[in-house]
Curated annotation (Swiss-Prot):
It is found in: Cytoplasm. This is DNA protection during starvation protein. Keywords: Cytoplasm, DNA condensation, DNA-binding, Iron, Iron storage, Metal-binding, Oxidoreductase. The gene is dps. The keyword Manganese does not apply. Belongs to the Dps family. It comes from Sodalis glossinidius (strain morsitans). It is an enzyme of class 1 (oxidoreductase). PANTHER family: DNA PROTECTION DURING STARVATION PROTEIN, GENERAL STRESS PROTEIN 20U. Its EC number is 1.16.-.-.
Length: 167
């Protein structure tokens, strides 16, 4: 017999869980978590777009660096999406939802040089890194704040690496 059931709350529907975080805290935390999931889905896709399409000086170094970034972004995305579900929410990670809700500007498909890609990536990594850092203090759930802190450390490092390669 399944113990999963929907529990009506004031602002949303949560899936039953024995996690005793306050329902209002769960609901607001899930909104913040999903905001970051959406940003990370977009950032992972953008990173791969740049990885595939750049050419020029320092190509191989940046190409390989971006693979590592994308792997880490996907790991954080997975952890954050799973936290949504742990709190009784539904993780919003589809391309359709991401397209509708991402704060990131559309990534240009008409750039080719390593430098142009690095500049475009720096703008987008900066937005996500700053938003994740802001989310740490927005949430009232310590476990979620800890998850965001881990992601923030990596995103700040990745932004630093990208900016350090811009000539």
């Amino acid at each position: 017999m399944s113990t999963a059931k929907l529990v009506k709350t004031k602002s949303s529907e949560l899936i039953f869980t024995r996690n005793d975080v306050d329902e209002e805290v769960k609901t607001t935390t899930i909104v913040t978590l999903n905001r970051i999931v959406i940003e990370l889905v977009d950032l992972a896709l953008i990173t791969k777009q740049a990885h595939w399409n750049m050419r020029g000086n320092n190509f191989i170094g940046v190409h390989e660096m971006l693979d590592g970034f994308r792997t880490a972004i996907l790991e954080h995305q997975d952890t954050i999406a799973e936290r949504v579900v742990q709190l009784g929410g539904v993780a919003l990670g589809t391309v359709q939802v991401t397209n509708d809700k991402t704060p990131l500007k559309s990534y240009p498909t008409n750039i080719h040089t390593v430098q142009d890609h690095l500049k475009a990536l720096a703008d987008r990594y900066g937005i996500v890194a700053n938003d994740v850092r802001k989310a740490i203090t927005e949430v009232e759930d310590d476990d979620t704040a800890d998850i965001f802190t881990a992601a923030s450390r990596d995103l700040d490092k990745f932004l630093w690496f990208i900016e350090s390669n811009i000539e």
